[in-house]
């Protein structure tokens, strides 16, 4: 046995000595990376430019050598045997034969080769993505020439099951961060913006103790432009807000209503009291016999002054603007009673109603003759005024074409006050009726005389409506008016009490009365001496004419209980009819 071992050792040494001494071929070996197997060799000192090389290979355990196609009699000094040795679980041998001109061939064989054990791992393919405060690293899979049973290429992760990645990040060679894992995506967080970092990625296989060369990437984090974005956003927002504000202000300016002129500033003018609106009712005549025909003629209305609302006993009487209404004027003389003292004359109310003891010139009343006097009513002095005496006077030469009365009684029912009237005040149980005797001439109206009828002599027609058309919004009131004398129970009574309570300023007589049946309906046929008063419009709520009969004093007393609507309308009112000549 010792002899056999000695012979084999000497023979091998002799063979190697023969190959090495030729100087044509040396350093035959496999170089494998990522399972790509390349056979390489070097020429010896005796090799020339015309030396050619041939390559053969075989699998471990086989006796027959296989020639590599494409690697026969070549002058280059490498041959790719990747496809011939792709089974990474097998062992292979390869040999190279060098032939020089005029010399014997020289052959050299490699050691046993296993790609799984002898292959090296290349650096991984990594992409480094810099961010403002982080760096992201993506590892791409590495493909190998090794084919699976189904024919697709295998990756390193599929061949080396224990493979993992090691990542390092260096900052100025003083600070480093480490990450490891089998995943393919990694990110280093918390970095400084606008700073350069050096990263390295290595593949490790613990079982075979393989380690790839590191992949090095130099990357710089992005600068922090957050403040720029914030500032830009704030500027854009401010500009948008400013544009919106300008548009809104422009819209408000365009749609703003114009400022009214100072001439329409009513509050500046009406400084004494707020503006009040009163309801007016105008009596419109529908027939005037004074004209040449029966058609309605233009009519001028006189000024009618109506006393204010009634006040409770003892209260100071004040006139209100809502109690007065002006409806036209006509050129006639002013009549007044003669028995009223001049110092007790009360001027018509002005725009600033005040209860004053002195007579003030009216600010809106027509001009009055020097001898004109107005009825004075002064309950403040506590005087008892005797009723004025009426004497028949001559017929007026000039009478108004027509007149109408408009009254807005804003007061409410209250206890009758103390009044001084131009009419005789009747005692309780007595009734005095005045009849109006009137004469109508073409284009002229004359008032005749006043006939005073005593008790028992009063006869009334069956139909005696109010001789003066009157409109009001106030319902009937059955209370009576009382004077300061306790024996005087009533102020106005009867259908003609209105005309009998009217005093014409500027003339000492009262309005003449005459018993005459006047119809308030404008549809009555036939002309009448009372055509002027017939033409006045009746109240809107007036019904048919109330039938009256001749009454004795007892009948007159019963009539006191049934007051007409006209009595209730003029209750508590001291009427003064004024014509301006």
Swiss-Prot record:
Major localization listed first in the record, in broad terms: membrane
Subcellular location per the Swiss-Prot or TrEMBL entry: Cell membrane
Variant or mutagenesis effect after changing residue 410 to A: Abolishes phosphorylation by GSK3B; reduces stability of the protein
Cross-link (Glycyl lysine isopeptide (Lys-Gly) (interchain with G-Cter in ubiquitin)): 449
Coiled coil (UniProt feature): none
Modified residues (Phosphoserine): 410, 414
Domain Fibronectin type-III: 18-115, 141-221
Impact reported for residue 426 to R: No effect on protein degradation
Topological domain ranges for the Extracellular compartment: 16-230
Name listed for the protein in its UniProt record: Interleukin-22 receptor subunit alpha-1
Gene: Il22ra1
């Amino acid at each position: 046995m010792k002899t056999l071992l000695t012979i084999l050792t000497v023979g091998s040494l002799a063979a190697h000595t023969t190959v090495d001494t030729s100087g044509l071929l040396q350093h035959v070996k496999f170089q494998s990376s990522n399972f790509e197997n390349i056979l390489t060799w070097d020429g010896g000192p005796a090799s020339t430019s015309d030396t050619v090389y041939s390559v053969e290979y075989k699998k471990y355990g086989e006796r027959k050598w296989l020639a590599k196609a494409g690697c026969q009699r070549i002058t280059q000094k490498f041959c790719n045997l990747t496809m011939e040795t792709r089974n990474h679980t097998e062992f292979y041998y390869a040999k190279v034969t060098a032939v020089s001109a005029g010399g014997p061939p020289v052959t050299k064989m490699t050691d046993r080769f296993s790609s799984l054990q002898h292959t090296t791992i290349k650096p991984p393919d990594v992409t480094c993505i810099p961010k403002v405060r982080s760096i992201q690293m993506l590892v791409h899979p590495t493909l190998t020439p090794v084919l699976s049973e189904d024919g697709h290429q295998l990756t390193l992760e599929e061949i080396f099951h224990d493979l993992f990645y090691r990542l390092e990040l260096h900052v100025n060679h003083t600070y480093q961060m480490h990450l490891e894992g089998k995943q393919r995506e990694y990110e280093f967080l918390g970095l400084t913006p606008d700073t350069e970092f050096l990263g390295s990625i290595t593949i490790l296989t613990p079982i075979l103790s393989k380690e790839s060369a590191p992949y090095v990437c130099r990357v710089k984090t992005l600068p922090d432009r957050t403040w720029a974005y914030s500032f830009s956003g704030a500027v854009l927002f401010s500009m948008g807000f400013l544009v919106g504000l300008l548009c809104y202000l422009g819209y408000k300016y365009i749609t703003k209503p114009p400022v009214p002129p100072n001439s329409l500033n009513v509050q500046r003018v009406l400084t004494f009291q707020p503006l009040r609106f009163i309801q007016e009712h105008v009596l419109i005549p529908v027939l005037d016999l004074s004209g040449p025909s029966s058609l309605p003629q233009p009519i001028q209305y006189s000024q009618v002054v109506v006393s204010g609302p009634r006040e409770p006993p003892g209260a100071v009487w004040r006139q209100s603007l809502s109690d007065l209404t002006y409806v036209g004027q006509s050129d006639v003389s002013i009549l007044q009673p003669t028995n009223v003292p001049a110092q007790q004359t009360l001027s018509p109310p002005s725009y600033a109603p005040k209860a004053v003891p002195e007579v003030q010139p009216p600010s809106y009343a027509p001009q009055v003759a020097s001898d004109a006097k107005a009825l004075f009513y002064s309950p403040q002095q506590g005087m008892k005024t005797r009723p004025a005496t009426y004497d028949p006077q001559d017929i007026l030469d000039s009478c108004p074409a027509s007149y109408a009365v408009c009254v807005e009684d804003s007061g409410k029912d209250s206890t009758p006050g103390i009044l001084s009237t131009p009419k005789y005040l009747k005692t309780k149980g007595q009734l005095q009726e005045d009849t109006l005797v009137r004469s109508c001439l073409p284009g002229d109206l004359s008032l005749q005389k006043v006939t005073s009828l005593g008790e028992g002599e009063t006869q009334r027609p069956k139909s005696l409506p109010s001789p003066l058309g009157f409109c009001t919004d106030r319902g009937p009131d059955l209370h009576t008016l009382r004077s300061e004398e306790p024996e005087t129970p009533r102020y106005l009574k009867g259908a003609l009490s209105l005309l009998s309570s009217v005093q014409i300023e500027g003339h000492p007589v009262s309005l003449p009365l005459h018993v005459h049946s006047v119809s308030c309906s404008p549809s009555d046929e036939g002309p009448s001496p009372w055509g002027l008063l017939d033409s006045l419009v009746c109240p809107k709520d007036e019904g048919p004419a109330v039938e009256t009969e001749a009454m004795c004093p007892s009948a007159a007393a019963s009539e006191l209980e049934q007051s007409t609507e006209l009595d209730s309308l003029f209750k508590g009112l001291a009427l003064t009819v004024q014509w301006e000549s």
